[in-house]
UniProtKB/Swiss-Prot annotation:
Keywords: Cytoplasm, Fatty acid biosynthesis, Fatty acid metabolism, Lipid biosynthesis, Lipid metabolism, Phosphopantetheine, Phosphoprotein. The gene is acpP. Belongs to the acyl carrier protein (ACP) family. Carrier of the growing fatty acid chain in fatty acid biosynthesis. One of its GO terms (cellular component) is membrane. This is Acyl carrier protein. Pathway: Lipid metabolism; fatty acid biosynthesis. 4'-phosphopantetheine is transferred from CoA to a specific serine of apo-ACP by AcpS. This modification is essential for activity because fatty acids are bound in thioester linkage to the sulfhydryl of the prosthetic group. The modification O-(pantetheine 4'-phosphoryl)serine is found at S37. Residues 2-77 form the Carrier domain.
Length: 78
């Protein structure tokens, strides 16, 4: 597991109040982890802060699973 993958899973668990062991790469934030739209906005903000990148709204809407978040950070993290 990469450092980015570990960090993303930790942030997801903290933001959504779930056990880190329950955060799988294929987990959907809304369907599997119980996030609502406000949770996902806060999650994106936490990812932006943690990785020092900006995630435009049109991209944030497409990040619906843990793996998509990991892929986005890997592609856009300096």
């Amino acid at each position: 597991m990469s450092n980015i993958e570990q960090q993303v899973k930790k942030i997801v668990a903290e933001q959504l109040g779930v056990n880190e062991a329950d955060v799988k790469n294929e987990s959907s934030f809304q369907d599997d982890l119980g996030a609502d739209s406000l949770d996902t906005v806060e999650l994106v903000m936490a990812l932006e802060e943690a990785f020092g990148c900006e995630i435009p709204d049109e991209d944030a809407e497409k990040i619906t699973t843990v793996q998509l978040a990991i892929d986005y950070i890997n592609a856009h993290n300096g």
